[in-house]
C-alpha cells in the first residue's frame, strides 16, 4: 500500500478556519450515491452536496468552493469542483446547486472546468479496490469582491484558480468525506 497523499492546503500558508456544515456529507464519513459520478463505470447521481458556512472574517469579499481528491492515481490529484465568485452575502449552497445546469448558483458565481472537463460538480469515481479516497470540500473566504475582477473567468483551469486562491484566501473551512467501492 502506498502512503496517503498530503492535503493540498498543507503546502499553503496557514489561514484561520471557520465552520463548514452539510446535510449531505460529513467529515470522515462515506458519501452516498448522490455524490458519486455517473460514468467511468459508476452509477451515481452526480449531485453536489448541500454546504453551509459561518464564522468567516467580516472583511470577506467573496467565496470560492472547491472539491479535490488528493488520492486519485494521477500524480496530481483530481479536481471535482472549482466554484468561484460566490458573493460574501451567500452562506449556503443547496443540494445540487453546483450540478447540471447550475441554475441553483447565486448570481455572479461561476464554475471552471473540473478534471472531467465539465463546468459543474463531478462526483466521486475512485478505481475499484482502492482504499476510500478523501474528497476535500473547501470554502475559501477571499479578500477580493470577485476573482473575475482579477482577470479570472470560466475558461481558467482549476490550477490557475488555485494559484489565485493561494494569494487571496484569508480563511478556509474544510470538510473531508470519503468514498470507495
Region roles according to the model:
Residues 1-181:
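N-terminus-centered regions that define maturation/targeting leaders and the start
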Amino acid at each position: 500500500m502506498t502512503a496517503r497523499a498530503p492535503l493540498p492546503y498543507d503546502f499553503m500558508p496557514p489561514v484561520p478556519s471557520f465552520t463548514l456544515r452539510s446535510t449531505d456529507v460529513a467529515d470522515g464519513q462515506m458519501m452516498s450515491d448522490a455524490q458519486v459520478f455517473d460514468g467511468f463505470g459508476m452509477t451515481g447521481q452526480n449531485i453536489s452536496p448541500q454546504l453551509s458556512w459561518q464564522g468567516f472574517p467580516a472583511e470577506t469579499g467573496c467565496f470560492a468552493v472547491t472539491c479535490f481528491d488528493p488520492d486519485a492515481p494521477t500524480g496530481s490529484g483530481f479536481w471535482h469542483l472549482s466554484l468561484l465568485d460566490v458573493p460574501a452575502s451567500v452562506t449556503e449552497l443547496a443540494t445540487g446547486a453546483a450540478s447540471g445546469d447550475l441554475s441553483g448558483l447565486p448570481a455572479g458565481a461561476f464554475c471552471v472546468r473540473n478534471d472531467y472537463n465539465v463546468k459543474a460538480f463531478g462526483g466521486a469515481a475512485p478505481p475499484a479496490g482502492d482504499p476510500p479516497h478523501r474528497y476535500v470540500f473547501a470554502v475559501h473566504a477571499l479578500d477580493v469582491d470577485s476573482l473575475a475582477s482579477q482577470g479570472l473567468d470560466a475558461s481558467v483551469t482549476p490550477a490557475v484558480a488555485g494559484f489565485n486562491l493561494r494569494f487571496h484566501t484569508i480563511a478556509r473551512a474544510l470538510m473531508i468525506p470519503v468514498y470507495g467501492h
